[in-house]
């Protein structure tokens, strides 16, 4: 028996070494097989991946050995378990190894995954774009990370363009993760507009575009300026107190009212309890979706059936999402009785009743939720980052104000003169670049097999177009971590359009709300700087341009500012 134990231990050790050896051949290029322990970041990544891979699979094999050698022999002691299970064990390990390497060779190279966790523990959740850039140095612009499933990361602009434009139709799918299917109920085609796929997505996107064409131009400008004046009146009251204030709620109130007017025909006072409840639910959904509990539910869908309260963050995510759905459902029922002229929900009900399109109530509810959440959260977060950079760079704030006053004087800013304010545009672009409010982007999925970067990508493969990595790519933006609006100006001081600067995405899935967001950002930013100065007194805490865990978006750490009303334009 001692001999058999030694044989079994030798088999275990050999299988582990074989596993690691095979992983080095598959995953590592010739230049990265030798793991060198030095202080460079790329070498640390190679070391930590190698150690994680080796450790995780030793643990798995150890668990197998523990079960085979200690548990089952106690159940049936007379049977020669050692002989039987040594054969089963060897066959099983060989099967695992072969099936694993057959599976991973379907994808581009990447770091070896840990058991259960994949590569998730080694991706910085706050700054994933930095991790993507580090892995790009090792594996190239297209590589595989094992998250809830094998996911292709595209970390270079040309590769992203190839995937989303050249192969735009093939990569236009969305994730079918449990955290999404929970609300859409349709694993094959999704629902709403952000998570919809195939014909369902095309039909809804067409209707949104057709509806929004009525708003673009003067109507949109007037709507944004109306709610900007409401915001200015609120800030003027705050300025009188000369106290520190967190601008998140006033900004959220103004921007939310713009998109609410468009989608459901409603406005709210900033402190309205119903409105505040919806904001809390949106924040919960956006934040909890990136937690470990939701990750595990996506990996192991059966976990969603555990009693509520065991996975608290998953429960909070689910409850908040369904409360939002119910809120929109109540509004939809009201719209069926009392139609609101000119809003998107009424437009969709008209289509339902005319039988031109068969849109379900759930599709309308989810689409309004997509428009509301997407149209508010990212814009609010961008402006919050903007105030931080102005507080830390008062000379930039002063230069923007000078340009705004030169162009508009005491007139209301308008989009027609935007090109006459190149420095303001450059500052906004630099804020968007550094804020990178969607660092994880929204994952795509292949609905057809396609070739990207020379790799054949199987159908139903998730893809993350890491546009955030492009925004911090030193080959594109010199000193990418510095706040430098001048990078968006040419030698003549005119605004410089940079092809790689794509904060709203590209291809068929480009953000539908891009024009709304650009209008909001420019008009609100220009109006506030025309009439207000954001400042701090000596001794006030200086806000740090660092992210806090906010979920799918990247908000800054909470901060406060003082506001001075300049009186350059009447706001009543």
Curated annotation (Swiss-Prot):
Pfam short name (any one): p450
Positions of transmembrane segments: 52-72, 84-104
Expression across tissues: Expressed in the 2 embryonic head hypodermal cells XXXL/R.
Family: Belongs to the cytochrome P450 family.
Protein name in the entry: 3-ketosteroid oxygenase
Source species, domain of life: Eukaryota
Catalytic activity: 5alpha-cholest-7-en-3-one + 3 reduced [NADPH--hemoprotein reductase] + 3 O2 = (25S)-Delta7-dafachronate + 3 oxidized [NADPH--hemoprotein reductase] + 4 H2O + 4 H(+); cholest-4-en-3-one + 3 reduced [NADPH--hemoprotein reductase] + 3 O2 = (25S)-3-oxocholest-4-en-26-oate + 3 oxidized [NADPH--hemoprotein reductase] + 4 H2O + 4 H(+)
Entry's localization field: Membrane
GO MF terms, alphabetically ordered: heme binding; iron ion binding; oxidoreductase activity, acting on paired donors, with incorporation or reduction of molecular oxygen, reduced flavin or flavoprotein as one donor, and incorporation of one atom of oxygen; steroid hydroxylase activity
Record-listed E.C. numbers: 1.14.14.-
Keyword Iron attributed: yes
Pathway listed: Steroid hormone biosynthesis; dafachronic acid biosynthesis
A GO BP entry: xenobiotic metabolic process
CC terms in the record's Gene Ontology section: cytoplasm; intracellular membrane-bounded organelle; membrane; neuronal cell body; perinuclear region of cytoplasm
Entry membrane topology: Multi-pass membrane protein
Entry function: Dafachronic acids bind directly to the nuclear hormone receptor (NHR) DAF-12, suppressing dauer formation and inducing reproductive growth. In a non-cell autonomous manner, negatively regulates body wall muscle arm extensions to motor neurons probably by preventing daf-12 isoform b activation.
Entry-linked InterPro entries: Cyt_P450 (IPR001128), Cyt_P450_CS (IPR017972), Cyt_P450_E_grp-I (IPR002401), Cyt_P450_sf (IPR036396), Cytochrome_P450_fam2 (IPR050182)
Subcellular location, principal: membrane
Gene null: resulting phenotype: The daf-9 mutant is dauer-like in head shape, cuticle, and deirid ultrastructure, intermediate in amphid and inner labial neuron morphology, and nondauer or abnormal in the intestine. Also, the daf-9 mutant exhibits abnormal reproductive development, molting defects and increased adult longevity.
Residues making up the signal peptide according to the UniProt record: none
Keywords annotated in UniProt: Cholesterol metabolism, Heme, Iron, Lipid metabolism, Membrane, Metal-binding, Monooxygenase, Oxidoreductase, Steroid metabolism, Sterol metabolism, Transmembrane, Transmembrane helix
